[in-house]
């Protein structure tokens, strides 16, 4: 698990890892692949303030979420890739 704690209404997401893609005998480089838009919430911020009251986040650690293609900031920690995104950039929680 990452040693990163998001602030405010931000969420730390571990994007779903895509299997290596191969077309015929040619490997598709990471730069040509579509970015995943699904991931697992690994850490959440404390929430956001509205009218002086702290509003907790709706998503929880462990939720699988869908988010916009260009949402968030990509970071690396402990050899893994993560996204820090605002809760408002999360489009849905995937129910299993």
UniProtKB/Swiss-Prot annotation:
- CDD domains, per database record: cpn10
Pfam families for this protein: Cpn10
Q: Which GO terms describe its molecular function?
A: ATP binding; metal ion binding; protein folding chaperone; protein-folding chaperone binding; unfolded protein binding
- Which InterPro entries is this protein grouped with? Chaperonin_GroES (IPR020818), Chaperonin_GroES_sf (IPR037124), Chaprnonin_Cpn10_CS (IPR018369), GroES-like_sf (IPR011032)
Key words, A-Z: Chaperone, Cytoplasm, Stress response
Q: Name one GO biological process term.
A: chaperone cofactor-dependent protein refolding
Q: Does the keyword Cytoplasm apply?
A: yes
Q: Which GO terms describe its cellular component?
A: cytoplasm
Cellular compartment(s):
Cytoplasm
For this UniProt entry, what is the primary localization, expressed as one broad class? Answer: cytoplasm
Keyword Ribosomal protein annotated: no
Expression induction per the record is: By heat shock.
Q: Give the superkingdom in one word.
A: Bacteria
Question: Could you tell me which NCBIfam families the record lists for this protein?
Answer: PRK00364.2-2 (NF001531), PRK00364.2-4 (NF001533), PRK00364.2-5 (NF001534)
- Functional summary from the UniProt entry: Together with the chaperonin GroEL, plays an essential role in assisting protein folding. The GroEL-GroES system forms a nano-cage that allows encapsulation of the non-native substrate proteins and provides a physical environment optimized to promote and accelerate protein folding. GroES binds to the apical surface of the GroEL ring, thereby capping the opening of the GroEL channel.
* Assembly and binders: Heptamer of 7 subunits arranged in a ring. Interacts with the chaperonin GroEL.
Instruction: Give the protein family.
Output: Belongs to the GroES chaperonin family.
Protein name per its UniProtKB record: Co-chaperonin GroES
Q: Which organism is it from?
A: Leptospira interrogans serogroup Icterohaemorrhagiae serovar copenhageni (strain Fiocruz L1-130)
Gene name of the encoded protein: groES
């Amino acid at each position: 698990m990452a040693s990163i704690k998001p602030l405010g209404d931000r969420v730390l997401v571990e994007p779903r890892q895509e299997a290596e893609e191969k077309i015929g005998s040619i490997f598709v480089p990471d730069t040509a692949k579509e970015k995943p838009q699904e991931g697992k919430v690994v850490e959440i911020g404390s929430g956001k303030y509205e009218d002086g009251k702290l509003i907790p986040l709706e998503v929880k650690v462990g939720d699988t979420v869908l988010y916009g293609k260009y949402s968030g900031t990509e970071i690396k920690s402990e050899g893994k890739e993560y996204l820090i995104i605002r809760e408002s950039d999360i489009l849905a929680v995937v129910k299993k």
